[in-house]
Amino acid sequence: IQSTSMDQGILTEDSMNSFIRTLIQAGIWKNKVPKQMARTKDGTQTTVKKSEAEADATASQDTRLGFQPIVSVDAELLRQQRRFSSPRVLLSENTPLEPPPLYLTEEPVALNRTSRRKREGKSHRGEYSVCDSESRWVTDKSSAVDIRGHQVTVLGEIRMGPS
């Protein structure tokens, strides 16, 4: 799922919960594919569920090798979820050309003096990126320096629910 900054509407809590439920049902939330496609002798495709032990063994092997899976979202799921929009997140099939802007433009466009006074200087939009100390955009990193200068660990997977 790619996120970019776009003003497309307000996202209600109920619609977000519904969307998260859809992601969990699709097996995307935990970076797992619940079913795997297999071909039979006559060439037709069938779905085969992986056993839980087999899935855990694969996950632990991937963790030892330092592999962090990239979640791939089916284009059909994105088309179904177009109504879920927010000013900060956009579900898209395309990879963004550049990272989202972290600050508003320095020069206000509006002629209204009240608005201009409010926007003087850089105002922070509340968007945070994972970046290193040289302020370069980082896409695949396991540790980083946060906005306060502290060394932090970037999680490859977030586990939810009881362990």
Swiss-Prot record:
Residues 38-60, 90-131 are annotated as: Disordered. Residues 4-119 form a propeptide. GO terms for biological process: cell surface receptor protein tyrosine kinase signaling pathway; modulation of chemical synaptic transmission; negative regulation of neuron apoptotic process; nerve development; nerve growth factor signaling pathway; neuron projection morphogenesis. Keywords: Cleavage on pair of basic residues, Glycoprotein, Growth factor, Secreted, Signal. Its main location: secreted. Glycans are attached at residue 112. One of its GO terms (molecular function) is nerve growth factor receptor binding. Residues 1-3 form the signal peptide. It holds the Pfam family NGF. It is found in: Secreted. GO terms for cellular component: axon; dendrite; extracellular space; synaptic vesicle. Belongs to the NGF-beta family. Seems to promote the survival of visceral and proprioceptive sensory neurons. This is Neurotrophin-3.
